[in-house]
Amino acid sequence: MPRKGPAPKRPLVNDPVYGSQLVTQLVNKVLLDGKKSLAERIVYGALEQARDKTGTDPVVTLKRALDNVKPALEVRSRRVGGATYQVPVEVRPDRSVTLALRWLVSFSKARREKTMVERLANEILDASNGLGAAVKRREDTHKMAEANRAFAHYRW
């Protein structure tokens, strides 16, 4: 275990095109094998497609999508006397954004459209309208937390 304590959080730079930290986080979630320029091309292309389809600011569409995907509760495993309980806990705001972006990107990859730009754009649009696999994942997470409410007193 490290003796110095947790590593300090590094500040995120605003994205150069939209001036948004959310877009920077999305680029970092799409990033694979250090190919940042490719990740930026995918994200900017997806946001352009979203703007063309909705006619509104793509960052506003992305924020609306994230609000529909961000979980408020999740379950965490807690071992008590030989049994493992799924204990519902509230999700910290920064973690909820991270989870929402992770779900958006992972469910984009699973879609059937031809290019990743189309997949990401359509997943963002679906999520902003309350549809799509990422929103379903949030609902499933909330259902799990609700089903395990009896173990809420094991919170830590």
From Swiss-Prot:
Coiled coil: none annotated. InterPro entries: Ribosomal_uS7, Ribosomal_uS7_bac/org-type, Ribosomal_uS7_CS, Ribosomal_uS7_dom, Ribosomal_uS7_dom_sf. Keywords: Ribonucleoprotein, Ribosomal protein, RNA-binding, rRNA-binding, tRNA-binding. One of its GO terms (biological process) is translation. Pfam families: Ribosomal_S7. One of its GO terms (molecular function) is structural constituent of ribosome. It comes from the Bacteria. Part of the 30S ribosomal subunit. Contacts proteins S9 and S11. NCBIfam families: rpsG_bact (TIGR01029). One of the primary rRNA binding proteins, it binds directly to 16S rRNA where it nucleates assembly of the head domain of the 30S subunit. Is located at the subunit interface close to the decoding center, probably blocks exit of the E-site tRNA. HAMAP family: Ribosomal_uS7_B. Belongs to the universal ribosomal protein uS7 family. This is Small ribosomal subunit protein uS7. It comes from Mycobacterium sp. (strain KMS).
